[in-house]
Amino acid sequence: MEAKVLNGKELSTKIKEELKIEVEDLKKNNINPGLAVIIVGNDPASRVYVNSKKKACAEIGIESFEYALEENTTQEELIELIHKLNKDDKVSGILVQLPLPKHIDEEKVIYAIDPSKDVDAFHPVNVGKLMIGNPDFLPCTPAGVMELIKESGIDITGKECVVVGRSNIVGKPMAMLLLAQNGTVTVCHSRTQNIDEVCKRADILVVAVGKPEFIKGSSIKPGAVVIDVGINRLENKKLVGDVEYESASRVASAITPVPGGVGPMTIAMLMKNTVKAAKLQAKMK
């Protein structure tokens, strides 16, 4: 059987269209969502991501403010800019494009963002709220994955869910969101023994390790839903995920493609968080 393709591009377009209508309504009530995007240095991949975030803002009607800083910007200068944006009423959400240059401490920079404007949901306050099951914002990639799982039609309750990868950005919050939906969750990582056997138990498999085609079809339970968060460029310039698509799609019941799966959903969820931030801030005034 051929797996159902979970098309993140189509789903993200639908979400953005709904947000566009919501933003039009908010503007009638004088609530104008705005997203400040900070990029330090000129990493080409970061530039691509920033451009797609700005494009999504334009499609929805969210005002975007870009701050492109030189590679040699100091940590103090960056934090000073963040403090300024924290106080700026035109800015509902602040996003610092990662990775940052080596001389800047990412943790300190994330801590500087006002939690009510932290639309990436990386601040410890937002991480803590997620842990106790009362989040204001959901981390964008895991939230996008949850929407794709919903699209697959599988009910998470009681299912074996395996997350491969334990990063703060994807793996850990992913496990929390699956747990919140009553999944039975196992997290695997580089030190996990018999990783293939663990993956084979999964009804829902989410892979986010940054290793090209790391999980093969032979490690997948027949009929599983497979979500591939990875995006890796091979030497021949081809983009592939962390799952070997060809072999996996013959075993899974549903699978995300790379590109066009999780990536567009991450951006749609960022937009959703920015709109929510604008609404929460309007209530606080």
Swiss-Prot record:
Listed InterPro entries: Aminoacid_DH-like_N_sf, NAD(P)-bd_dom_sf, THF_DH/CycHdrlase, THF_DH/CycHdrlase_cat_dom, THF_DH/CycHdrlase_CS, THF_DH/CycHdrlase_NAD-bd_dom
Binding site for NADP(+): 165-167, 190, 231
Highest taxon of source: Bacteria
Any one cellular-component term (Gene Ontology): cytosol
CDD domains in the cross-refs: NAD_bind_m-THF_DH_Cyclohyd (cd01080)
Pathway where it operates: One-carbon metabolism; tetrahydrofolate interconversion
Catalytic activity: (6R)-5,10-methylene-5,6,7,8-tetrahydrofolate + NADP(+) = (6R)-5,10-methenyltetrahydrofolate + NADPH; (6R)-5,10-methenyltetrahydrofolate + H2O = (6R)-10-formyltetrahydrofolate + H(+)
GO biological process: L-histidine biosynthetic process; methionine biosynthetic process; purine nucleotide biosynthetic process; tetrahydrofolate interconversion
Enzyme Commission number(s): 1.5.1.5, 3.5.4.9
Pfam family, one: THF_DHG_CYH
Alphabetical UniProt keywords: Amino-acid biosynthesis, Histidine biosynthesis, Hydrolase, Methionine biosynthesis, Multifunctional enzyme, NADP, One-carbon metabolism, Oxidoreductase, Purine biosynthesis
Keyword match Membrane: no
GO MF entry, a single one: methylenetetrahydrofolate dehydrogenase (NADP+) activity
Function: Catalyzes the oxidation of 5,10-methylenetetrahydrofolate to 5,10-methenyltetrahydrofolate and then the hydrolysis of 5,10-methenyltetrahydrofolate to 10-formyltetrahydrofolate.
Protein family per UniProt: Belongs to the tetrahydrofolate dehydrogenase/cyclohydrolase family.
Quaternary context: Homodimer.
Protein name: Bifunctional protein FolD
Source species of the chain: Acetivibrio thermocellus (strain ATCC 27405 / DSM 1237 / JCM 9322 / NBRC 103400 / NCIMB 10682 / NRRL B-4536 / VPI 7372) (Clostridium thermocellum)
Lineage per the UniProt record: Bacteria, Bacillati, Bacillota, Clostridia, Eubacteriales
